[in-house]
Every structure is written in structure tokens, then in C-alpha cells.
Amino acid sequence: SKGERFIECDYWSGQMMWEFYQELESGNGPVYLKVDHLAEETIQTIEEILHTNERPSRGRFHEGRGTNYRQDMVEMHISEIGFCSGHSASGVWVNEKAETSVKGLYSAGDMAAVPHNYMLGAFTYGWFAGVNAAQYVNAVEDSELNQSEIEAEKARIFAPLNCSEGLPPEQVEYKLRRFVNDYLQPPKTRQKMEIGLKRFEEIKQDIKRISARNPHELMRAAEVSFIRDCAEMAARASLFREESRWGLYHYRTDFPQKNNSDWFCHAHLKKDEHGNMVSFKKPIEPYVVPINQDEAVSYDRLRIQKDVALAD
């Protein structure tokens, strides 16, 4: 709100969100995005891409507010929590061939534990994931399908279509997303995350009562179950990692410091023999391209440092 730039890099990250959060909590907010210094051609390009492709509702929203990028700054805020490669590597573990830990299962894009690479990265990683998967399939002989398992899964997936007096999927999804925002949103605390786990377990009963009237609602019903699983995984992984890391994304008030001696590792989840989620550590592999110490700590140094004059 003072009209001063406070971070070096505009690319979003957990540390950027931490500095953003600090500004809001310190009373310096709101935080604004300034683009009125850009050339008219650049602003038109932003509007053309953002308003017609990436975020169609953004143009209508700003028009309704009377915000003109050429003369007005855009008020910004921290978005709600998300799990899509949250800090650049938070999806299904894959190796350099896009193989997961499940033999024959491959993953690419934002659901894989890969750095941010957007559309071009999805194309590239998806290409060699497909090539490697095809090579794997060519070497596997056809096996007999278990029809009883198939029928059981079909019955589970299509169950909402047979529930005439159930709950609308969008209502259960809204309730679940509120739980995520209320109990998993950083800053994180053990107490809130444990309550969240309890709520995620309870909402399984609501999911069983979801009703679907058409294929679209059936899809939404299936998505609610997936969202619930992701919420539980996020809570358990956050409880397991007893430190703070990646700026605001994993800031725990009960463990506010980064602890490289114990937690410079991957925190993974798997199912045990009873189907329950369990956490374990996986070592970090050596960097392909070594980085120096300045690069290693640059992530934590996004705030612009001001020279403070000493009093006489």
C-alpha cells in the first residue's frame, strides 16, 4: 500500500507467498500488482492472452471493478491452498523415465513430482512417458482379466446413479474444500491438521450418500473422492515433516525453522498391508548440475534489502 517494491522476483513460489503474507500481517497491505509502466503493446498482449485464454473471467472481473491496467494497480491476495505441484515437486514420484513405483504405471504433467514446466513441459514429459510406456507394454504378454474385480469397481463408480435421494456432489465438494481451507491452510499447526484428518474421515459417509443424475454429476462425484484422498495425503505429509520449508507453503508454527540435518529429503506416502497411509523418507539424489552456496540459499532471499542509515 506504500507503493514500494518488496520482492526481487515476481515468479510465484512459497517464499514469495511468505513475503506477501508478511506484508499483509505487518499492516503494510494490501499488496498491488503494478503494470501501468508497461508499453501499450505489452498490456494489450496480456489482455489478449489472459482474458481470452488463460483466465476468461479475469477481464470481466476487473471491468466490473473499474480496473484499467493502464492507470490502475491490481489488488492482489494469497490464493486458496492447492496441491498441484505445490512447491515444484509434490506429486506422484517418478524417475527419469516417468515410471512410478507401481510397475507399468507412468505419470507426467502436474500430477508427477517434477518441476514447474507448464504446457511445453507437459508435452515433453508426456512424450517420453508415452514412449517408455509403449516400450513396456510391448514386452508384456496379455493376461486374463479378473472379471469379478472389474464388476465390483464398476458397481462402486456407478453407485451414485442408483442413489435417488442422496447428496448433490457439488455440496459435498464445497464442504470438503472448506475443511481443507480451514484446517490445512498455512500457517499450519498440529492441532488443526489432526482435526482435519478427523473431518476427512467423517466425510467418507457423505461421499457414500452422493447422488448423480447424469454423467457430468457422476464425474463430480468421483472427483470428490479423489479430493478427499489428496486432502488426507496433504495432512499426513505435513504432519510427518516436522520443520518449515518452502516459505509459506509449509510453514508450521510449532516447527518454524528449516531443519536440513533431519529433513533435507523427500517425504513420501504409501499404503501399508492394511491399506492405510504411512509416511517415509526418501533421500535426495545428487544434483545433475551442482549449485554453489549462493544459489542454494537464493530462494530464501527474495525480499529486497534496504540500507538502514545508522543514527549518529
Task: Enumerate the language-model features and the residues they cover.
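Active-site-proximal helix-loop elements at catalytic-domain edges
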Residues: 60-85, 200-216
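Glycine- and aromatic-enriched mobile tails/lids
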Residues: 5-8, 87, 93-107, 111-312
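An anion/pyrophosphate-binding glycine-rich loop and adjacent beta-alpha core
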Residues: 1-75, 85, 132, 136-138
